[in-house]
Swiss-Prot record:
Molecular-function GO term, any one: magnesium ion binding
Organism: Roseiflexus sp. (strain RS-1)
SMART domains linked to this entry: Enolase_C, Enolase_N
Role this protein plays: Catalyzes the reversible conversion of 2-phosphoglycerate (2-PG) into phosphoenolpyruvate (PEP). It is essential for the degradation of carbohydrates via glycolysis.
A Pfam family per the record: Enolase_N
Record carries keyword Transmembrane: no
Residues where (2R)-2-phosphoglycerate binds: Q165, K339, R368, S369, K390
GO biological process per UniProt: glycolytic process
CDD domains in the record: enolase
Catalytic site positions: E207, K339
UniProt protein name: Enolase
Length: 429
């Protein structure tokens, strides 16, 4: 029996991929093993997310320091959890939630709580001499995800680009994850050349995608289609498109303002807009296609497009089982984006994935725009057989680290590994 009793918990302030501070937590157990986790941070955040605790001291990191969260881990949380069993994840997470005592984890900070939650799981996995995906997922963990690669950025992730935040490719026709990654990388390099040939800038955004100045939102889809074809792949067969327009950012006074196009659309008109795009492009997944509080619009979107397209709730659902339960009962959306730091513990994250699966929904495991070398989400997506991962372009080490971990997992699984491909989706095409 591995000795997974917690001996010590320590936290420190480190930097994320955008040069902002974040929290890293180490959990030591009696076997001598240690688990370490770095917590990510988002750029466009849902109003209903768990609260990331920042210091607010303008003399350090422009107020973005996390020394308060670090202090909470090193004192309050460490004192409460030392002597507890790191392998009892549900109990650990329940204690963390009780210790905080707020609805949004705002007292101790969702960043402090998540760091401890994940580091406990990693320490227990190490004590059992198991990779994290196997420790969390058991013998059934064997599905490698289709990568949802953000290769063109706009909105809050770039400047002078499109109204919409992310344009992505999904190599659904690849025979393995390794090949899917190669296809994605080749299309990414092809896109760079397409943009360069048009005299555009090949600067990259937070998540590694290019952020050229484009005349219209649709121009982004057009150059991606060209890049796929130039790389030698067939859009609509081998490679599908996905989008995250982050429409909450465009919603004001009951309308969606597309500044690039000089238009303001009602919810019904926005649904028409997406229906038209889906009819003309091989769009398989649309995330936050409407604003986070536009419930009536979401129901309309699901009724119109739900059998053809994966409609993912991110800001809309914020990995929150209460919002997810309502969306399931009201038939708004048909997929949930899973971001660990939106809800703040591993247990609650796994609960959200389970609830989605029971309803016949899909779950897409996701990074945040502020990332690090931490690869927990790569193990999580295999552990849950979720079948889809969203972790940026095949560029920048903070993104590539996750892809490289998935390559290792696929190799380790050998003949048991199964690449999700089109099977990742629960729609008719």
């Amino acid at each position: 029996m591995a000795d997974t009793i917690i001996e010590a918990i320590t936290a420190r302030e480190v930097l994320d991929s955008r040069g902002n501070p974040t929290i890293e937590v180490d959990v030591y157990v009696e076997s001598g093993d240690m688990g370490r986790a770095i917590v990510p941070s988002g750029a466009s955040t849902g109003a209903f997310e768990a609260l990331e605790l920042r210091d607010g001291d303008k003399s350090r990191y422009g107020g973005k320091g996390v020394l308060k969260a670090v202090e909470h881990v090193n004192t309050t949380i460490a004192e409460a959890l030392e002597g507890e069993d790191a392998a009892d994840q549900v109990s650990i997470d329940r204690k963390l939630i009780e210790l905080d005592g707020t609805e949004n984890k705002g007292r101790l900070g969702a960043n402090a709580i998540l760091g401890v939650s994940l580091a406990c799981a990693k320490a227990a996995a190490a004590a059992h001499d198991l990779p994290l995906y196997r420790y969390l997922g058991g013998v059934h963990a064997h599905v490698l995800p289709v990568p949802m690669m953000n290769i063109l950025n706009g909105g809050k992730h770039a400047q002078n680009s499109t109204d919409f935040q992310e344009f992505m490719i999904m190599p659904v026709g690849a025979p393995s994850f390794r090949e899917a990654l190669r296809w994605g990388s080749e299309i990414y390099q092809s896109l760079k050349k397409v943009i360069h040939d048009r005299g555009g800038s090949t600067n990259v955004g937070d998540e590694g995608g290019f952020a050229p100045s484009l005349p219209t939102n649709e121009a982004a889809l057009q150059i991606i289609m060209e890049a796929i074809e130039r790389a030698g792949y067939k859009p609509g067969e081998q490679v599908m498109l996905a989008m995250d327009p982050a429409c909450t950012e465009l919603y004001k006074d009951g309308k969606y303002h597309l500044e690039r196009e000089g238009r303001s659309l009602t919810s019904a008109e926005m649904v028409e807009y997406w229906d038209d795009i889906a009819a003309r492009y091989p769009l398989i997944s649309l995330e936050d296609g409407l604003a986070e509080e536009d419930w009536e619009g979401w129901k309309l979107l699901r009724a119109r497009l739900g059998d053809r397209i994966q409609l993912v709730g991110d800001d809309f659902l914020v990995t929150n089982v209460k919002r997810l339960a309502r969306a399931i009962s009201e038939q708004a959306a048909n997929s949930i984006l899973i971001k660990l730091n939106q809800i703040g513990t591993l247990t609650e994250t796994l609960d959200a994935i389970s609830m989605a699966n029971r309803a016949g929904w899909t779950a897409v495991v996701s990074h945040r725009s502020g990332e690090s070398e931490d690869v927990t989400i790569a193990d999580l997506v295999v552990a849950t057989n979720a079948g889809q991962i969203k972790t940026g372009a095949p560029a920048r080490t903070d993104r590539v680290a996750k892809y490289n971990q998935l390559l290792r997992i696929e190799e380790e699984l050998g003949s048991a590994a199964h690449y999700a491909g089109m099977g990742a989706f629960r729609i008719r095409r």
